[in-house]
Amino acid sequence: MTQQPILSRIEYFTQLTDFARTAKKGDTVYVATMGFKPVYEPVNDLIQQLIGAARRGAQVTVLIDAFAFSHPDGTEVGPLWYSRSLTATLSRAFKYKAQCVNDLREAGATVIITNKPRFRFANPVAGRSHIKFAITNRDVYIGGCNLTDPHQVDAMVVRRNDPEAAKILIDFTAKVAAAPRNTVRLALDGRDSVVTLGDGATLIIDAGVRRHSTIEQTALQAITKASRNVFITLQYPPYGALVATLDRARRRNVACTALFNTPQRFAPPANVLMAATCMAMQVRGRALLALNELRHSRRYMHAKILVADDTLIIGSHNFVNAGVRFGTAEIAIMYNSAELASRAQQLIARQLGAPLL
C-alpha cells in the first residue's frame, strides 16, 4: 500500500467523479454518505457519472442514510418522516433526490437507504448512520465528507491499493444490505468493530448503540496521553467529556487548539443551544478560553480531525457525545504518524486560507 494523501471535499468529489467517468465492467465503486444534496453541481455530476458507470457494467453501490429523506430540507419535510416511500412527496427538494436514487437503480446500481425509521414521525436525528467512505477498486477513502455542499471544510484520507480495508468495508456493506431496515446496529449485532490494518492503522466502526462509542473513547484517551499538542476540528463547540479532557490537557501545559463553527453558523434553534454551550464554558472558565473559534473564515467547518502529538484520528465522529446519546453509527481511522498528523493540519489551513491560530 502506498502513502495516503488527505483530501478536501471537492478533491474527494473530483477523484470519485474522474474514476466513475471511465469505470466499466470489472470496476467497483462504493460511496457511503449521510447527507445527500444533488442540487450541488459537483454532487450531481458525480451521481450522473455513477449512473453512466453502472450502465457500462461497473459494480456501483451507494449507501445513503435515511436522514437525507427524513430530516427537513429547508422548510420541506422529508418523505421518510411520515411515509415508507421516497416518492410520497412532490416537494421540490426531495423530488430530485428520489429521482437520482431511481435513476441509479434503473442503471443497475445498488442503492441502500440505511437506518430507515421503524415508525412514522420518529426523531429524524436519532439512530442515524453518519458513516462516510468510498471504494474505487482497491483504493479506500475514509473521513467526514457528505455528498452535499462542496465548499465546506472537510477531510478524507485515501488508502491507495488497500484490498484489506476495501474487503472490510465491502463485507460491512453486505451485512447492512441484509439487516432489517438496513440498520448498521443490527448488521453489526450491536458491537463496535476495531480492526488493526496491515500498516498498523486502526479502523473503527461504531455500531450506533446508544451511549456507547469506541471512537469517542479512543479520542479522549489520545488527548489524555498527549504531552505536547492537541489539534481538533469539529462542527460544534466542544462540551461535556471532550471539553473537560481538553481542559485537563491545557492544565498539563499541552498546547490545545480547537476549530469549530460559531453559534451564528447554525439555524434556530441550534444556534441558541450552541451559544448557551459557549457561554457555560466561559462562565466556568473551562477550555474555551484556550480554544480558537472559526472567526477568521467564512467557510463552514465539517472536518472531524484529532491530532494528539503524533496520533491522528480522522473520520465522521465529532468527538462529542450528542450523536452517541442518539445511537449514531460512525467510522474513523487512527494512525500513529507525525507526517500524516502534520499533513492533516496543513489541509485544514489550506482550506481556511489562513495559518492555524
Language model regions located:
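Amphipathic alpha-helical interface segments
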Residues: M334-L357
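Hydrophobic side-chain positions on well-ordered alpha-helices
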Residues: A53, R248-A249
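Short, surface-exposed acidic/glycine-rich loop or hinge patches that mediate macromolecular interfaces
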Residues: I10, Y236-P237, P263, A338
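Short acidic, glycine-rich surface-loop motifs adjacent to enzyme active sites
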Residues: V29-F36, I232-L234
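HKD-type phospholipase D/PLD-like phosphodiesterase module
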Residues: T2-D27, G35-K225, L259-T311, H317-I333
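Beta-propeller domains
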Residues: A207-A222, R228-R248
